[in-house]
């Protein structure tokens, strides 16, 4: 079994926040791949289904971001999972809006949700870092992540979530390259081929003159008419 965790804060007031893009990612997977209804478990909401041959549990911790590790740890212990079975979708200030990167293990880079998961299960789990951009100054970060995505962000956000859903099966079986390709195809669709120039029609040739059947005497007479 794989555990896909989407980080965010519970409640309608936070639903459209940049900080909740992890929730949005797992919700898109659930909707597009026929997962079961969301149920309250492990201090969060879970939905079960399959991605290809892999059984997958989607988890949205409802502990609020800073305590996400409590929910993740509880689910892992119940299913006897290791950090290698876990992939966490989270917002990433250090990536431009719409950019996506995979990471296995490593530090939490100051992200409070990841910090909590580190404290409960260690750092060896996988992450899908979802770029939301940076407000430009560290003092503006809290307000920035707890505000909704702007209208101008909606197109790339929709494409990113569709790409994540497209590539979810590849991600579940460990094919990170194919997952990233699926996202890239949504974010940068192939350019339409330029129409080939129409072949030139062959130029019409002037009809050949009919041979002159007049006798030499008739030709001479015609000159003096």
UniProtKB/Swiss-Prot annotation:
Belongs to the PTH family. Residues 184-225 are annotated as: Disordered. NCBIfam families: pth. Hydrolyzes ribosome-free peptidyl-tRNAs (with 1 or more amino acids incorporated), which drop off the ribosome during protein synthesis, or as a result of ribosome stalling. This is Peptidyl-tRNA hydrolase. Keywords: Cytoplasm, Hydrolase, RNA-binding, tRNA-binding. The record marks 91 as: Stabilizes the basic form of H active site to accept a proton. Monomer. Disulfide bonds: none annotated. Gene3D superfamilies: Peptidyl-tRNA hydrolase. Pfam families: Pept_tRNA_hydro. It catalyses: an N-acyl-L-alpha-aminoacyl-tRNA + H2O = an N-acyl-L-amino acid + a tRNA + H(+). InterPro entries: Pept_tRNA_hydro, Pept_tRNA_hydro_CS, Pept_tRNA_hydro_sf. GO terms for biological process: protein quality control for misfolded or incompletely synthesized proteins; rescue of stalled ribosome. Residues 198-210 have a biased composition (Low complexity). Its main location: cytoplasm. Its EC number is 3.1.1.29. TRNA binds at residues 14, 64, 66, 112. SUPFAM superfamilies: Peptidyl-tRNA hydrolase-like. It is found in: Cytoplasm. The record marks 9 as: Discriminates between blocked and unblocked aminoacyl-tRNA. GO terms for molecular function: peptidyl-tRNA hydrolase activity; tRNA binding. It is an enzyme of class 3 (hydrolase). GO terms for cellular component: cytoplasm. Transmembrane segments: none annotated. It comes from Cereibacter sphaeroides (strain KD131 / KCTC 12085) (Rhodobacter sphaeroides).
